[in-house]
């Protein structure tokens, strides 16, 4: 037991926790052509003796107390990815892509929601690729998370807009690239529902950077 500064929590363990057991099921579909790619996954997990860390409502050393608990639980969700090439201009390709994921996790026998579960997330992007450069813009949407555990605060949804440009001065076959990126262009206040520190530290605001990447 003791304070964990990185998560801003006073954590309490339990030496009597049992081993977890899980039964997992997954349904997966995939389709791919030279111009189109699609995949979707539906999964469900049933846990015996699921171990999780939850807030108790107590304060110790000026930090909220989080304790490890154990109960049966059910987790299910969906994941989706797709990409489509829209056009080809000589050595350049224009394409769009998207990602979606959603997870639900509940403690069995009326135990409520598992803490720190991310909400529905949607991400879409458009990208122009060339032997010497890539241009990309993307939008990421995160829904509100109101399905929370006891003492856990709801999390407001947010939308991030990002853009980047990559230049490969010696072509795609050489592992040298200069990257200019702009993240959270509209400087929105964003908090991840799965973060221990969401109530204290939001995600970074508007951010511009230039980096050099050399791969070996």
Regions found by a protein language model. Name each.
Residues 27-31, 80-84, 124-128, 163-167, ...:
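Residues on the lipid-exposed face of transmembrane beta-strands in outer-membrane beta-barrel proteins
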Residues 46-48, 146, 167-216:
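C-terminal beta-signal and adjacent terminal beta-strands/loops
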Residues 37-47, 64-147, 189:
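Gram-negative outer-membrane beta-barrel transporters
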